[in-house]
UniProtKB/Swiss-Prot annotation:
This is Peptidase T. The keyword Transcription does not apply. Gene3D superfamilies: 3.30.70.360, Zn peptidases. Binds 2 Zn(2+) ions per subunit. Cleaves the N-terminal amino acid of tripeptides. The gene is pepT.
Length: 412
């Protein structure tokens, strides 16, 4: 099934996801992978073909464009943002599969490798009976996070351009790199974007509307041991691997991702590597509540002090850095931005699902740059892996929401 209202939506999505735009946390370049710049150049060309204005790629690989106002009064400028990169999972040779009129049963993604999208494991599938699903072939992610957001924004401005009877102010759009590795928005230029408020199209199922995110930090423990021949090690050896395990044991056992939900924060053991002489343990710290976030950071500082005191020397050094903050701190003073999106959904018969993100978006950083930017659903499910899928109808609804926000903005 193709979209009747947005005739190029499905084709555009299927084409875009085949671009491998996986970002690379180990890279120090901007963007982190060359393929993102290639994709940006392709997007720029297609936006030019649509006849948008002020189209450019800035030095940080953000594709910017404007759909100029067609109204004779001053209205606010609204922006829509999505990211080009995909998560740290195989994205080479993405081969999307289309499941028409989904029957509610298990979906075989890859017969040869016996990879099955099972309803028992993913009961969210039951929400999509009779819909058109786009899945992976079981060997890659899909990239609906966030190619669906890009497609929805482009299809919305295309629709508005084709329907000049819909009055609107200036509409700004931007597609950026490296969201998945938490760096892209560091280089977002709010002044250059020139919107009064914006939305990221980077959420999950229909109805999601998010204006609160985690506060986030990374704690890196660098451990220095003393390596001595095991046969003569008594009183001399300090085993960095054992210190690494001590550090891990000191963390609270229930404040972990797999045991928390809602507004509960956590410590997540992200990485560890060690031998006798040296080691490194990396945790990420997350909490919506600022006071609890600060307390968690204080906990890791005290942990290091305790370990060093035990060994009578500095065996552990801590590198603690903040990554992003809860955008709700900013958006709470601009709740009209949330109210407009909520009203747009209700006008379309969509029930808004307002909840705090257990993560972050580009909007987490952009909001603190002075541009309030909540997050709206883009339709995908099971992000960052081979079981990712999106319903065509969900992407249509997200596109409808963009158009409706634009209408409401012009009426304010």
């Amino acid at each position: 099934m193709d979209s009747k209202k947005y005739s190029t939506l499905k084709e555009r999505f299927l084409r875009y996801v085949k671009f491998n735009t996986r970002s690379d946390d180990a890279s120090e370049t901007i963007p982190s992978t060359p393929s993102q710049m290639e994709f940006a150049k392709m997007l720029k060309k297609e936006l030019e073909e649509l006849g948008l204005s002020n189209i450019f790629i800035n030095k940080a690989c953000f594709v910017n464009a404007t759909l100029p106002s067609n109204i004779d009064k001053k209205v606010a400028t609204v922006g829509f943002i999505a990211h080009m990169d995909t998560a740290d999972f195989n994205a080479e040779g993405i081969s999307p599969q289309i499941v028409e009129n989904y029957d509610g049963k298990d979906i075989v993604l890859n017969k040869e490798q016996n990879i099955v999208l099972k309803v028992e494991e993913f009961p969210n599938l039951k929400n999509y009976i009779s819909k058109t699903l786009i899945t992976t072939d079981g060997t890659t992610l899909l990239g609906a996070d966030d190619k669906s957001g890009i497609v929805e924004i482009i299809e919305a401005v295309k629709y508005l351009k084709e329907h000049p009877e819909i009055k609107h102010g200036d509409i700004k759009i931007a597609f950026g790199p490296d969201e998945e590795i938490g760096r892209g928005a560091d280089y977002f230029d709010v002044k250059e974007f020139a919107a009064d408020y914006a939305y990221t199209m980077d959420g999950g199922p229909i109805g999601e509307l998010e204006y609160e995110s985690f506060n986030a930090a990374q704690a890196k423990f660098k451990i220095k041991g003393v390596s001595v021949h095991p046969g003569t090690a008594k009183g001399k050896m300090i085993n960095a691997s054992l210190i690494a395990s001590e550090i891990i044991e000191m963390f609270p056992k229930d404040e972990v991702p797999e045991k928390t939900e809602g507004y509960e924060g956590f410590y997540f053991l992200d990485e560890m590597k060690s031998n006798c002489e040296e080691g490194e343990v990396v945790y990420i710290i997350r909490d919506h509540d600022k006071a609890k976030f600060l307390a968690k950071k204080e906990f890791v500082k005290e942990l290091v002090e305790k370990v060093n005191k035990k060994y009578g020397r500095e065996v552990v050094k801590l590198e603690l850095k903040d990554e992003y903050y809860n955008m709700g701190e900013i958006i709470k003073d601009h709740m009209y931005v949330v109210d407009i999106a909520k009203q747009a959904m209700e006008n379309l018969g969509i029930k808004p699902l307002i909840k705090a993100i257990r993560g972050g978006t580009d909007g987490s950083k952009i909001s603190f740059m002075g541009l309030p930017t909540p997050n709206i659903f883009a339709g995908g499910e099971n992000f960052h892996g081979k079981y990712e899928f999106v319903a065509l109808e969900s992407m249509e609804k997200a596109t409808d929401v963009i158009v409706e926000i634009v209408k409401l903005n012009a009426e304010r």
